[in-house]
């Protein structure tokens, strides 16, 4: 498992380097996909870099920017990588820095390894069931995955402010989310609300900066798999709103149900 974690970290960091080159160039070549979401040159470049690492593991890969794989082909996969080469493409285009690279290893529908890299800040989040969840700052000019793993700060981190804190989407605050926030205000009195793009919301809960993350709007498996792995290893739950159980992966329908991340 440690070697697979090293591979996923290398893939995320090298794709982060490639993304930053395009980010700083300002030439994004934006297209609109069939689902009306944006696609940039950086999404495709990141996908290709990640695939070049993960194919060496002989574990199949399901990527947002890869070819569509029929359920009949993948339903018997015991292991697979689930990848979002750039989570938060809208944030990338807006140049606000709130986009991530997400890589997860799934075994028997459950997240086992999670790696999330934030290229603009150099923050790397990673987890396995054996070692737990960690955060470390990366210098992309000079790094070694083994050293990074040993230097990581174990999650959750200490938080001074005990005010009940909710993190929610910057781009997708639904009426149901607003109702949930109001319900928490009724329960707890003062409530802090943080808004962020991409899988940073899951990272913020795993860090202990927020108490919960309600997501009552559409997401796909590649948006959440890595973040769920990290949250679970930090002691949080990612609960499917319909089943009231932990979210499972490599389902026939890759669109997630609503979910709630909490202790």
Give the location of each predicted region.
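A structural micro-motif
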Residues: 58-59, 164, 191, 236
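Acidic beta-strand-loop-alpha-helix segment within the catalytic core
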Residues: 104-202, 246-247, 251-263
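Oxyanion/phosphate-interacting regions
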Residues: 1-12, 16-17, 148, 178-187, ...
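Glycine-rich active-site/cofactor-binding loop and its immediate structural neighborhood
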Residues: 79-116
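Residue-level signal for inorganic ion chemistry
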Residues: 19, 43, 54, 89, ...
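Short, surface-exposed acidic/glycine-rich loop or hinge patches that mediate macromolecular interfaces
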Residues: 44, 66, 171-172, 218
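Short glycine/proline-enriched turns and hinge-like loops at secondary-structure junctions
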Residues: 73-75, 93-97, 127, 252
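N-terminal subdomain of lithium-sensitive/metallo-dependent phosphomonoesterases centered on the IMPase/IPPase/PAP
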Residues: 1-86, 179-182, 196, 203, ...
